[in-house]
């Protein structure tokens, strides 16, 4: 089971989240049939979204839109405060060769664009914030968003490692944030630690990457585990929801589906589940609409 662990330094000056999202990203790859680069880009976005949702309280939902002008198109993800996330990438077929060190390139194929977050508190007035893409590598873009939009200096590392067959081997990451009251010396100390940290891909390749991430962040310094939360890919789509969507269409469109198409098939963008509505189903909807 995937998990997110919330921690805080003994001094109370910093907090860190570390995540294992391997099963989540693996499931997303299976549902969307993504090729290598698309898998990594989508996976990083899902991880980033789970970090943002973990910062919220109550029954909030956070939507992340990574909107680029290059090969990937846009990536959309939605996460809630219960550890559930869903998402899709506009172009699942980007398959760029790895670098000499085995890294999968993402930034060059995201292009220029924006990192958009929409936080829904359930009050009917969602809050939207937009920052420019800095590198298109997702992790740096999330860190920039947190620092600029939420005014919380942050360091973020996240990645998806693939095996020889380009299947998800491991996925995860971390977020480190400065809390109010941190001294200049403490901030300087942690900045130096972050600069000296091994690459996120190296940490994820460790036998126990959760422990490796925590060790890289805190070293020998004491810290406290605040909570451990389970994470998973879970879509809330349903036949009833799509039936309601069909009901919202003009009657003429439903009649066209009935008489010309002999039915309708709706595919959920977020998870790929297909819902079939035969002629009898459409007749019921048309009658209910009358």
UniProtKB/Swiss-Prot annotation:
Q: Which UniProt keywords apply?
A: Chaperone, Cytoplasm, Disulfide bond, Redox-active center, Stress response, Zinc
Note the Pfam families from the entry: HSP33 (PF01430)
* UniProt-listed CDD domains: Hsp33
Disulfide bridge partners, by residue number: 235-237, 268-271
The entry's localization annotation reads: Cytoplasm
A single cellular component GO annotation: cytoplasm
| Matches recorded under SUPFAM superfamilies | Hsp33 domain, HSP33 redox switch-like
Which InterPro entries would you find in this protein's record? Heat_shock_Hsp33, Heat_shock_Hsp33_C, Heat_shock_Hsp33_N
Q: What is its main location?
A: cytoplasm
Output the PTM entry. Answer: Under oxidizing conditions two disulfide bonds are formed involving the reactive cysteines. Under reducing conditions zinc is bound to the reactive cysteines and the protein is inactive.
What molecular functions are annotated in GO for this chain? protein folding chaperone; unfolded protein binding
Q: Name one GO biological process term.
A: protein refolding
Described by its record, this protein's role is as follows:
Redox regulated molecular chaperone. Protects both thermally unfolding and oxidatively damaged proteins from irreversible aggregation. Plays an important role in the bacterial defense system toward oxidative stress.
Task: Please report which protein family the annotation says this sequence is part of.
Answer: Belongs to the HSP33 family.
What protein name applies here? 33 kDa chaperonin
Q: Which organism is it from?
A: Streptococcus equi subsp. equi (strain 4047)
* The encoding gene: hslO
